[in-house]
């Protein structure tokens, strides 16, 4: 959808997933470092998350196809292509839906090779970047530039996810991927505000070089904000788990002390009875 809602929708999807990852991966990492950690709960969490991502993708496809001015699953009619921009967006969502399904199969079916889920996710991100690269030809300079900046996050994420096929559960790669997904989500919102200003705000001059310079700088700010979100959530998870661990130790020590006091009192009573 070539409007504000058409960019806010995928932006919200990517932002929600990124924020969830910024909490999930630190939790998983710190649980791995502890003994007797309930890892089977994280497998269930992976399945639920993959199902949600698949649902988001299907919702995106339906939104692109069945909006009032959408193609309604018609690709070609009377010697004309129909709403190819909507079809490109639908194709992007389709690959992410496949990625979500493969993620679920990885944890539900034992004979699916480990790492296929990351490979398919890398392919989905690459396809998104590939589609965006040819998405903005013959557009005004600002329109081309603001979309092309997104390619850095997409192809960087593709490389990072591809490395996860080999280095699975690597916390640094997972957090790097998380930061790029958050960046992608916030940048979709930024594209919507720049190209389709809501609330009657003035439109941007798409041929002004100063606007190109500002948007480039703004992209850097967006990534700094994404890194800050990942760092803050990582720290909060660490502090929370550390506090819970200390609280649990305190309860265990208290119980042990009560047991030792009961044992001591029992010994005294036994000694007095013998006398």
Curated annotation (Swiss-Prot):
GO terms for biological process: innate immune response. The keyword Transmembrane helix applies. Keywords: Endosome, Golgi apparatus, Immunity, Innate immunity, Lysosome, Membrane, Phosphoprotein, Transmembrane, Transmembrane helix. One of its GO terms (cellular component) is endosome membrane. It is a multi-pass membrane protein. Induction: By type I interferons. The modification Phosphoserine is found at residues 270, 272. It is found in: Endosome membrane; Lysosome membrane; Golgi apparatus, trans-Golgi network membrane. It comes from the Eukaryota. Its main location: membrane. It holds the Pfam family DUF716. InterPro entries: DUF716, TMEM45. Plays a role in innate immunity. Mechanistically, promotes alphaviruses RNA degradation by interacting with the viral polymerase nsP4 and the mRNA-capping enzyme nsP1 and thereby interfering with the interaction between viral RNA and nsP1. (Microbial infection) Interacts with sindbis virus nsP1 and nsP4; these interactions lead to viral RNA replication inhibition. (Microbial infection) Interacts with chikungunya virus nsP1 and nsP4; these interactions lead to viral RNA replication inhibition. Belongs to the TMEM45 family. This is Transmembrane protein 45B. It comes from Homo sapiens. The gene is TMEM45B.
């Amino acid at each position: 959808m070539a409007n504000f809602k058409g960019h806010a929708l995928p932006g919200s999807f990517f932002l929600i997933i990124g924020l969830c990852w910024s909490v999930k991966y630190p939790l998983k990492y710190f649980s791995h470092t502890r003994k007797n950690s309930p890892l089977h709960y994280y497998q269930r969490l992976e399945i639920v998350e993959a199902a949600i991502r698949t649902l988001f993708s299907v919702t995106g496809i339906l939104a692109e196809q069945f909006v009032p001015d959408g193609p309604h699953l018609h690709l070609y009619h009377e010697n004309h292509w129909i709403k190819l921009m909507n079809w490109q967006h639908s194709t992007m969502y389709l690959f992410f839906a496949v990625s979500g399904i493969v993620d679920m199969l990885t944890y539900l079916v034992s004979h699916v090779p480990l790492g296929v889920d990351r490979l398919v996710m890398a392919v989905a991100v690459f396809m998104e970047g590939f589609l965006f690269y040819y998405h903005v030809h013959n557009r005004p300079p600002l329109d081309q530039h603001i979309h092309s900046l997104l390619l850095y996050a997409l192809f960087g994420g593709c490389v990072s996810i591809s490395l996860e096929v080999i280095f699975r559960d690597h916390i640094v790669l997972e957090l790097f991927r998380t930061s790029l997904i958050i960046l992608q989500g916030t940048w979709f919102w930024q594209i919507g505000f720049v190209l389709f200003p809501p609330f009657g705000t003035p439109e941007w001059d798409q041929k002004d070089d100063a606007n190109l310079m500002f948007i480039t700088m703004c992209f850097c700010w967006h990534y700094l904000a994404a890194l800050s979100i990942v760092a803050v959530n990582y720290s909060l998870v660490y502090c929370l788990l550390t506090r819970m661990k200390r609280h649990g130790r305190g309860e265990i020590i208290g119980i042990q002390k009560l047991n030792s006091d009961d044992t001591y009192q029992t010994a005294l009573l036994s000694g007095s009875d013998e006398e």
